[in-house]
Amino acid sequence: MDFTGVYHKASEQMCYPLNEDELIVNLKTGYDVKRVFIYYGDPFEAGILGGKEQWAGKKEEICFKKHLRHHLWWTTTLTPRFKRCKYYFELHTEEETWYYFENGFLSEEQIGMEGRMLQCFVMPWMNPADVNSTPDWVNDTVWYQILSLIHISEPTRLDVI
């Protein structure tokens, strides 16, 4: 797998609330990745005190992908029950499977190691202030684009010097 082609972070255009209940999660990969699964759920499903609890998450395949010139853009919409979400990805190529976490990639053997801390991606809170809500009046507005090239004057003598 080409690890340099895989990119995600839990902010900005990669993970954001679509509305008050839905969360968009995007992942960029190379064309060698054939299937992607996301494991997601509430960060506190396994408890809040640490210890030996194991967070598992719900497994779901990401089916929607956009073909860009050099990458694939995988997109899914999640509905976190408590408006917070913890997740990681399972990436499949023709011959191998890797798990993608905040701190890098793990093989199937590495993910099952006793005592390993899994640094999952986390959307701590879907804040209503982060939801884009366009006012209704925008649909009735006429928008103009001013082409600045029309307003460029001839070069003056000072511009040439």
Q: What is each PLM-predicted segment?
A:
Residues 1-33, 111-129, 133-134:
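Non-catalytic, glycine-rich low-complexity segments
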Residues 31-83, 92-113:
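Aromatic-rich carbohydrate-binding modules that target alpha-glucans
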Residues 40, 147-149:
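Short loop/turn segments at strand-loop or loop-helix junctions that form parts
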Residues 135-140:
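Extracellular/periplasmic catalytic domains that process cell-envelope and extracellular macromolecules
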Residues 143-145:
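Structural recognition of the beta-strand scaffold that forms the well-ordered cores
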Residues 151-154, 158-161:
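Single conserved hydrophobic/aromatic residue that forms the stacking wall/gate
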